[in-house]
Amino acid sequence: MAVSRGFQDFILDLLRPLDPVSRRMFSGVGLFHGGVMFGLLVRDILYLRVDETTREQFERAGSSPFTYQRGEREVSLSAYYVVPEGLLDQPDALLQWTRNAIAAARRSASSARPATSRSGVRQYRRTRNADSG
């Protein structure tokens, strides 16, 4: 599942206006913006983050989710879809799809964070103190 240096450089050059950060991950490369992962490079294929808001757009364009082999079975990671065919030849369109992927990654990150509130913290402390006393 390696990524060639040439493909990685090509994608980073296309996405340069968005100032992405790339990090090696296993045998692929993760693409980050503002602390959230919005893309994945695996086997010289670009995958972008989707959510319930953007998934249909990718499916209408004929894209499919990221899949990989794990032993005898195929695993599908439905949060990342392959970039639609021909999009790498349309830099402006690719940037818009990537902006949508960054927005999807942010929405997913914010919904995944546990809600915290001072009253919840106080309640926990009261309960904990009552149990120990």
Where are the predicted features?
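Charge-dense, helix-prone N-terminal extensions
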Residues: 1-133
